[in-house]
C-alpha cells in the first residue's frame, strides 16, 4: 500500500485554517480584534514569503489556547468549523482523497497547523492519519508551549520519518500534494511530488523539475 500524503491549508482547503482561526477569534472579540488581526496577517505574509519564525508564530497562536478553558475552546472550535472550515473544503479535494482511498492507499495529512484545530478537520475529510504541530497540554489545559518538533518545513520530514518508523511504512510509491514552497523538503522525499494550486516559488520549481501541477479549485 502506497502512502498518499496531503498538505491541508490551501491544498485540500481553499484557505488557511490557522489564519481563519485567528480571524474567528478576532471577529468574536476573544482576542483584541485589531492588534491580533494585524499580527496574524503579518505572520501569514511571512509564511507566504518563506520568512516565518515558527517559534514566534507558535507562541502567538498558542497564547489563546493557554488563556482559556478547554470547554470554551471546544465550543469556539465547533462554531469555527461550521463558519470557517466547512465552506472552504474543496469538492475536488474530497474527490482526490476518494481516488486514493479507492486505490487502497494509506491516507495522511501533514500540516504545520496545530492538532487542536486540525484533528476535527481531518475527521471531516475522512482521513485517520494526521501529523500536525502539537500544543503541550498539562492537567487538561494547554500550556502555550509546543510539544516536540513543529511539522513545518524540514520539520515535516522529521515528523514523517518518525511516523513511518512507528507505523512500519516506507515512502515507496508515495505521493505528496502541497501548494507551498515551504514544503519543498518533503516534496523532495516522495516518489511523486505534486504541486497543487502552487505559490509562485513552488510553481517555478515544479516546472523546472517536471513535477505534476494540479488545481483543485478550477
Name these PLM-found stretches.
Residues 44-47, 54-70, 129, 134:
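Short, compositionally biased "basic patch" segments
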Residues 1, 75, 82-218:
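C-terminal cap/substrate-recognition subdomain and adjoining C-terminal extension
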Residues 1-49:
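Active-site neighborhood of HAD-like aspartate-dependent phosphohydrolases
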Residues 56-92:
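Metal-dependent phosphoesterase signature
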Residues 16, 68, 155:
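Conserved active-site and cofactor/substrate-binding residues in soluble primary-metabolism enzymes
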Residues 22-23, 62, 191:
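Amphipathic alpha-helical segments within well-ordered protein domains
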Residues 8, 15, 53, 71-74:
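Catalytic cores of transferase enzymes with a strong primary signal for eukaryotic protein kinases
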Amino acid at each position: 500500500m502506497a502512502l498518499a500524503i496531503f498538505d491541508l491549508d490551501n491544498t485540500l482547503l481553499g484557505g488557511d485554517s490557522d489564519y481563519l482561526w485567528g480571524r474567528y477569534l478576532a471577529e468574536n472579540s476573544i482576542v483584541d480584534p485589531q492588534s491580533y488581526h494585524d499580527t496574524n496577517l503579518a505572520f501569514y505574509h511571512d509564511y507566504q514569503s518563506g520568512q516565518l519564525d515558527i517559534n514566534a508564530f507558535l507562541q502567538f497562536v498558542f497564547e489563546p489556547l493557554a488563556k482559556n478553558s478547554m470547554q470554551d475552546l471546544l465550543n469556539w472550535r465547533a462554531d469555527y468549523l461550521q463558519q470557517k472550515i466547512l465552506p472552504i473544503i474543496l469538492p475536488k479535494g474530497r474527490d482526490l482523497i476518494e481516488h486514493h482511498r479507492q486505490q487502497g492507499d494509506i491516507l495522511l495529512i501533514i500540516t504545520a497547523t496545530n492538532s487542536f484545530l486540525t484533528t476535527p478537520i481531518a475527521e471531516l475529510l475522512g482521513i485517520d492519519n494526521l501529523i500536525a504541530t502539537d500544543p503541550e497540554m498539562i492537567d487538561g489545559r494547554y500550556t502555550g508551549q509546543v510539544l516536540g518538533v513543529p511539522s513545518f518545513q524540514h520539520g515535516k520530514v522529521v515528523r514523517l520519518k518518525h511516523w513511518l518508523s512507528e507505523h512500519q511504512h516506507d515512502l515507496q510509491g508515495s505521493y505528496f500534494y502541497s501548494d507551498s514552497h515551504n514544503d519543498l523538503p518533503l516534496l523532495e522525499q516522495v516518489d511523486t511530488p505534486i504541486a497543487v494550486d502552487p505559490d509562485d516559488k513552488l510553481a517555478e520549481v515544479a516546472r523546472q523539475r517536471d513535477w505534476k501541477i494540479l488545481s483543485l479549485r478550477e
